[in-house]
């Protein structure tokens, strides 16, 4: 839940060809954070499968409510309605949508009714968190942003 409104701010700037280098770095940080999300989603699902009574769902929902409240308040304090393309309403909608997505991913029901759409979907191509190749770069100036390692070259251990 935390950080993601900040990521979207830089993707919004990138969508206007502003601070492109910063957006590249934010994209890497975003991917790293998502790897943590996936790791913990898998761990939580497995723990729940092995021991269904390990987690009290009420506590999980309270934690999510608090995180959503804090993230909305912080984003509204930092950005509010002062950036074209970001409003207090879109901040609330995005944060609650994201919370619902995270809850679904660990096998729980969504917390917020009516928040089933990402209001910043148009920025997902700038995030390029799945490595779909939506981000274009000058071939001679670009850098590799994928975590994928080549497996076609063998014998490097001998050096």
Question: Where are the regions a protein language model picked out?
Answer:
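Inter-helical turn/loop segments and adjacent helix faces that build the functional surface
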Residues: 9-28, 43-62, 79-86
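Extended, helix-rich structural scaffolds rather than catalytic motifs
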Residues: 52-159
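Alpha-helical bundle segments that constitute or directly flank the non-heme di-iron/ferroxidase center
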Residues: 1-14, 38
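Generic structural signal for well-ordered, non-transmembrane alpha-helical segments
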Residues: 1, 27-38, 65-72
């Amino acid at each position: 839940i935390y950080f993601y409104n900040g990521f979207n701010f830089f993707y919004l700037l990138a969508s206007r060809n502003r601070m492109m280098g910063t957006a590249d770095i934010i994209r890497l940080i975003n991917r790293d954070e998502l790897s943590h999300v996936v790791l913990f989603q898998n761990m939580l699902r497995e723990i729940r499968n092995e021991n269904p009574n390990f987690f009290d769902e009420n506590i999980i929902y309270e934690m999510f409510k608090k995180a959503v409240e804090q993230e909305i308040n912080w984003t509204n304090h930092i950005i509010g309605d002062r950036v074209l393309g970001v409003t207090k309403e879109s901040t609330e909608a995005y944060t609650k949508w994201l919370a619902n997505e995270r809850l679904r991913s660990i096998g729980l029901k969504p917390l917020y009714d009516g928040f089933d759409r990402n209001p910043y979907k148009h920025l997902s191509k700038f995030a390029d968190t799945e490595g779909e190749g939506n981000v274009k770069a000058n071939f001679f100036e670009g850098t590799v942003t994928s975590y994928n390692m080549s497996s076609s070259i063998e014998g490097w251990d001998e050096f």
